[in-house]
Each structure stands twice: as structure tokens, then as C-alpha cells.
Amino acid sequence: MIINNLQEFYRLLLPNAPLISIDYGSKKIGIAISNQERNIAMPLNIITEASKKAIIASLLEKIEQYKACGIVIGLPIDMSGMQTEQSAIVIKFAEELTKSINLPIYLQDERLTTKAANNFLKSFGIKRKERNNNDDAVAASMILETVLNSINKL
């Protein structure tokens, strides 16, 4: 189920279980995971499967492997706060994901996270090709970190 309120999302989470975060892109999907205490977000991997069915299967595998209790998906919003064409694609994906798993899903504004992730990796001297291969997982961890920080203030 897609939850639009962070307090409601938090209320539905199991104690001592991690969250998974998704940075959903048209070519690749970044995945991040929190620790069980939900105070640290870490990049996990990139999914490059072509079909939604394969993407969802990969996600379900990670959710089961890490025993995640909730999902955070980055929602592309333009700089004026409006949803974009990509927002509709992400929302549709989230709706499809709800058919395969019964976990709360929270959509988090992801403005500028991929750019911030790329700049973060660049600051460590990582070459462009490697940055482009990893920036979506780092962006997913930044999206998740935003939610974790907000949850820990509740």
C-alpha cells in the first residue's frame, strides 16, 4: 500500500527491521538499505533488468534477503514542486509493486539527489564511468537518509 503521510508510514513499520529505498530510473534502478535501527542508509546495488516483472522479482529478492519492513521510493518532482512525466511512471511502478508485496511504500521527493550523488562520488575522485554506474544507488541512499532523518524526529 502506498502511504502519503510519513507518520502513518512509520506507524506501519515493524521494529528492528530495515527499510529499502529505490531510485527508479528509465535505464537503471538504484537500491539502498538501512540498518535495523534505521539510522544509517547504505547504497546496495543497481538493477538493470529490462522488464518490470524482472525488476520486481529482483526487488522482492532483496526485500526477503534483508527482511525489509517498508519501501521508500524517490518521487521526481520539478524545482517548482510539480510532478513530472517521470513522476507518473514512478507512481505507476509503485502501484504495480503493491500488487506483489504487502509492505508500506512511501514516496519521497527526490529533487537533485542523482546530481548530489554524482557530485559526492566526484569529490572522492571517482571517474565519470564509475560514477554513472553507481550514482543511482548512492541517490537511493540519500533518499532513504532523508526519510530516516525525518522518522527519527517523530
Curated annotation (Swiss-Prot):
* Location within or outside the cell: Cytoplasm
Per the record, the domain of life is Bacteria
Q: List the Gene3D superfamilies.
A: YqgF/RNase H-like domain (3.30.420.140)
**Does the keyword Cytoplasm feature in the UniProt annotation?**
yes
| CDD domains (UniProt xref) | YqgF (cd16964)
Got a GO cellular component term for this one?
cytosol
Q: Which GO biological process categories is it annotated with?
A: rRNA 5'-end processing
Q: What class of enzyme is it?
A: hydrolase
Among the Pfam families in the record, one is RuvX
State the similarity comment: Belongs to the YqgF nuclease family.
Q: Record's HAMAP family?
A: Nuclease_YqgF
The function of this protein is: Could be a nuclease involved in processing of the 5'-end of pre-16S rRNA.
What protein name applies here? Putative pre-16S rRNA nuclease
Naturally occurring in which organism (per UniProt): Rickettsia bellii (strain OSU 85-389)
The top of its lineage is: Bacteria, Pseudomonadati, Pseudomonadota, Alphaproteobacteria, Rickettsiales
